[in-house]
């Protein structure tokens, strides 16, 4: 299947944020998340495929202790590498953690097994907003593991107030020459600002978004993709667009940096558990997914990695610092206005490319 993906920087950013995560986890003292779920024992083993260091320090060992199922984990460095592997006939993996946009593609390629929700009772712990997904209606093939957002990154000392709308970037001259925007993905942000879907392929809506960006272009210092965060860090701009996980790292180094998801909403990424269609131990894979969705285990993983969990029962157990960190949790009303970047199809991608070319040439 030819890929006509919405050209979000998400796959590359995902890899970058996990590379940072791998380094930070290695530097963190080991924490035990042991949780006994009762006398559940079983035979067999699981092979897991995920980003490096993307569970708690003892999550898999604790699962083995409670279930009797041993788990071996292999790691990939990019989502494209993962997709190539799972597309092969001899990968032998039973469970994977994958970015939502690749979940959508694997569903289309019939690479994933239908989940049996009766084997995942802890699905009841999820926030209702995560019980369904536009890229996987009914959660038939995926369960959410961790999530995050894209929003406005800003230098606090340069702004008179915390930005609450994409308009400060897209429809204002207040910070002329001090704005960095993420290239073609800016079309989606303009659509959100105008009240449309980030994934719209409606010609009239795209024309309006393009016209907005052409008017704003003279006030933008650079269209640079994820490098906008570096410009912000270096003091070259005061406003940029970034993923919350990367901005959180920057905020730890510079307390003058802030982050806000606008009231119009933004992009929401998810990483999900899936079971490959060729899995040899789907029952064990279901048990591991359910284990990760347990309230105490979900809380331990989320606080260890400092990423947002879709697990409402887990959030209730987390520290106040975590729960009140708006870089992680922008608020449920804002989350409801966020959406993932989807595959737009060849015609939709071609139309958006044409609109963006006009913006670039203006």
Feature roles, as predicted:
Residues 39-105:
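Early extracytoplasmic/lumenal segment of secretory-pathway proteins
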Residues 97-219, 224-233:
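Extracytoplasmic ligand-binding site segments that recognize negatively charged/polar headgroups
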Residues 102-107, 233, 239-256:
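A ligand-binding cleft/hinge motif common to bilobed small-molecule-binding domains
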Residues 13-22, 28-44:
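N-terminal twin-arginine translocation
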Residues 276-336:
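Mature extracytoplasmic/periplasmic domains
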Residues 1-16:
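N-terminal secretory signal peptides
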Residues 148, 206-215, 251-277:
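Periplasmic-binding protein-like
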Residues 151-158, 193-195, 269-284, 289, ...:
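A bilobed periplasmic-binding-protein/Venus flytrap-type ligand-binding module shared by bacterial periplasmic
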